[in-house]
Amino acid sequence: MRADTADYPQLFLEDVPMMDTRAPVEFAGGAFPNVLNLPLMTDSERQKVGTCYKQHGQRAAIELGHRLVSGRTKELRIQAWADFARAHPEGYLYCFRGGLRSQIVQQWLRDEAGIDYPRVTGGYKAMRNFLLDTTRQATAQCAFVLVGGLTGTGKTEVIAALGNALDLEGHANHRGSSFGKRATPQPAQIDFENRLAIDILRKRAAGVGRFVLEDESRLVGSCSLPLELHQGMQRYPLVWLEDSFEGRVERILRDYVVDLCAEFVAVEGPQAGFAAFAARLTQSLANIVKRLGGERYQRLSTLMARALAEQEAGRGVALHRDWIVGLLREYYDPMYAYQRESKAERIVFSGDREAVLAYLRECAAGAVDG
């Protein structure tokens, strides 16, 4: 029989399959990648046992739990756990603290299915704390450089091209702007933090000591950056990415119109997908009405509505350039120009995509200080 483990780095570095025996509501609040929720108790059962524990103590709560999970219900749950164990003989199971729930699942698997399956010592809480420490240690021990630039310069493309970059927007499933929502939901805050920490862990294990990040605000959509990382981003050196105005317009057209529409269509189908895409784009503009001002908003909204109607009629996406041009010139560019001025003393390099990539790769190799 394999022993229980507290080797948290190995679990995440090797993407070991794990069975989470917490209740669904706990799992939804935060979990790890490559984990399947096969709970010992449903949310309702867990609530009843918790109430019993508070009123009558541990022994009564355990007895109630055994009554609630018995007979056919118990058989089906053991079968699900056994199926997972057989499919993933290298895996582990865990509960919140690595205590009673995971021990019961272990015992039932052994007694009823003849399967010895190890658990993670300390459970979810210990693994979560390990990942939080991973991020904190990286911000204290590693070097970081930020990639900034005007909207549409392709900062995300630079991040994707570098092996030592942390894709904050990818982990948050959000493009990081007022128009950044995707067709699929953002992860829970804890899931976002866990994914980021695992990314850091794996890159550090591969020898990365200098990380590249996109210059983001504290919030990437609804996901909040870890405090230590955000504080560091107020002082990290900054590389400024440049591109032509025309190139930026075309990139925004691709990312926020063509690709976003395709995402919605893939999720919801052609008709419903386009309707959802149009509603999302329209709402994104409405979200910044106070910052745009009423007259400017009405003008851009009219241009957007005309472009969406043209697109829905099958006549292409060319008209979207009209509102994109207006939004860049009248809103985003002045805002970013102010931000660049406020961060000017931290800018260590500026250039186009190829020049920035070359500089950042030299930084990663230690050829220049970043």
From Swiss-Prot:
Known catalytic reactions: 5-methylaminomethyl-2-thiouridine(34) in tRNA + selenophosphate + (2E)-geranyl diphosphate + H2O + H(+) = 5-methylaminomethyl-2-selenouridine(34) in tRNA + (2E)-thiogeraniol + phosphate + diphosphate; 5-methylaminomethyl-2-thiouridine(34) in tRNA + (2E)-geranyl diphosphate = 5-methylaminomethyl-S-(2E)-geranyl-thiouridine(34) in tRNA + diphosphate; 5-methylaminomethyl-S-(2E)-geranyl-thiouridine(34) in tRNA + selenophosphate + H(+) = 5-methylaminomethyl-2-(Se-phospho)selenouridine(34) in tRNA + (2E)-thiogeraniol; 5-methylaminomethyl-2-(Se-phospho)selenouridine(34) in tRNA + H2O = 5-methylaminomethyl-2-selenouridine(34) in tRNA + phosphate
Gene Ontology biological process terms, A to Z: tRNA wobble uridine modification
Gene3D superfamilies: Rhodanese-like domain (3.40.250.10)
Molecular function as annotated in GO: transferase activity, transferring alkyl or aryl (other than methyl) groups; tRNA 2-selenouridine synthase activity
Swiss-Prot/TrEMBL keywords: Selenium, Transferase
Entry similarity comment: Belongs to the SelU family.
Subunit structure: Monomer.
Function: Involved in the post-transcriptional modification of the uridine at the wobble position (U34) of tRNA(Lys), tRNA(Glu) and tRNA(Gln). Catalyzes the conversion of 2-thiouridine (S2U-RNA) to 2-selenouridine (Se2U-RNA). Acts in a two-step process involving geranylation of 2-thiouridine (S2U) to S-geranyl-2-thiouridine (geS2U) and subsequent selenation of the latter derivative to 2-selenouridine (Se2U) in the tRNA chain.
Protein name, entry field: tRNA 2-selenouridine synthase
Organism: Azotobacter vinelandii (strain DJ / ATCC BAA-1303)
Gene (UniProt): selU
